[in-house]
Amino acid sequence: IAQNTIKEMTRLGADISNIQAIVGPCISQKNYEVGEDFLETFLLEDQYNMRFFANGKTNKYHFDLPGFCLQSLRNAGITNPEWTGHCTYEDSDKFYSYRKSTHLGEPDYGRLISVITL
């Protein structure tokens, strides 16, 4: 999404050196446990994506979503992307987390929506 957005912004006349990007609240690596199928999907795209995974429990990994997003922004030409540092799983009093709700056995979970226009 980020790379396509930046591509469209530059197509519309934006100077890439003036584009700033911040990755908003999202789940942090220590709380984002994924299976081998998730890992394999990323490695098929690029073997170097292994750097975004840490070993977890047997046959499980922890995915660095903010790190992956930051690198995607850098790959698209953004020189200094940032992350707010907010983990939606840990900061559940501020943000909704489907993963945390299911881990706690809650019957429902909140929803978030973002709208981006150019």
Regions found by a protein language model. Give the residues of each.
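Active-site microenvironment for binding and transforming phosphate-containing groups
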Residues: 1-118
